[in-house]
């Protein structure tokens, strides 16, 4: 039951955010602003609404469907996880107050904090048992997006309401890190939607439910992926009581609309400030800007499925290598990102520490070399300058362009021009993120239609998740290329089980070398994450933390006037 005062506040906030509606990781964030700000040290007062602007809409409110950054921000606020990352990016407890590990490194015993779901139902270890068992049972039917996080779990048990035990078939170095994005769901709600053979879990249209049941610091009161999602404080939350009454997340159709709303005072914070407008925002009085490089890797993805019958030349390592040498990263970074990015060459980023292979470097921009590679391989230019394959097929490809990626069109134009210079024609296909994901997997998760895409991955601190996304068993789940290599998959299993950090690092380096050789992607740049807050807020954390921790939602609050 919602308290009347909170309901009135929430409805008022919703009205404000709707009126404004038009349409990531940093290890060393910096703060800047045009006016004096005491947001770093001021004490927070209880109450109030934080109104946040985004330009990329969530792609689902159902944890078995949603996969993008905004969806995971919502999941992080709504659902318990056993562990989370702290401000130093070290694993700490979330729902778990403490845990122990058996001598054989197979069994984890978690002692849980008492709490309640937002509808008043007790949150217990039975919810964890149900979530784990259900996800594993239906991983090939409807729960594949989340099943990878608990791969290798042999059994789970709940000896009492506040104790949860997970046993793995063999030691797993990645166990705790992978439990961070694995969210515990309310059994009494989700079990009603399992359906025959588990087929209902990813078909449940949760946005039609209105108010949803959550166990985190906030829970969804109203959801609109193209407008405003309102989250209210959960009185039964097991963690520190949040300062805020509610959070409003508004999606804008473009960055200019979001910035206009910010300037007009219609929102309090902007997620992903456009790099072209950062200096303008910094010049505003009483504004705090947090910025820094994030593990967000901008990439070009090839359709790597060998069963695709058209444009099979895109499977040729020579073609992909030539195209990689025709990507002008420096120009993209300066033109599209105003210098606020760094060249990328791996699926991992520096936040992964020693796991990032330092010997891998971006392919040198060299059009002469790219042309020579294609000439030597028998790809000949026609009268119009576009090449044909030895079989006589024209080398002209469609490139899927998700429109929620900053600077996407300009980035594509730079690459398109250089690829044309080496005899490869490309046609951009702009579409929203959900449509782009469907187009890549078409038909039915088989990756038989698309040629290339330009997107990005927001990586995790432990490398396991990013390495998992290109495995054979991620067809129809996390894979966005259709890449499958049994040699790579075998190494993935080895690194996951390797408890010696140095040996695991060596395996992960070898995996990156395979991806560099096979080129399911051309990695372009590691971008900055830039977030802005109006004055009057305290408890602001590093930009990336909102994706991997509830700490930002526990600490942020409005300062006293």
Question: What are these model-derived regions, one by one?
Answer:
Residues 147-196:
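Surface-exposed binding/hinge segments that line
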Residues 53-103, 133, 213-215:
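N-terminal lobe/hinge region of extracytoplasmic solute-binding protein
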Residues 206, 234-280, 413-416, 425-427, ...:
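Ligand-site clamp/hinge motif
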Residues 86, 90, 182-242, 246, ...:
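Gly/Pro-rich hinge or "lid" segments in bacterial periplasmic/extracellular proteins
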Residues 17-20:
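C-terminal motif of bacterial Sec signal peptides marking the signal peptidase cleavage site
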Residues 97-141, 159, 165, 258-261, ...:
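Aromatic- and charge-enriched surface segment that lines or borders ligand/interaction sites
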Residues 124-131, 161-167, 216-217, 245-246, ...:
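Alpha-helical secondary-structure segments
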Residues 224, 228, 235, 295-298, ...:
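Detector for C-terminal structural segments
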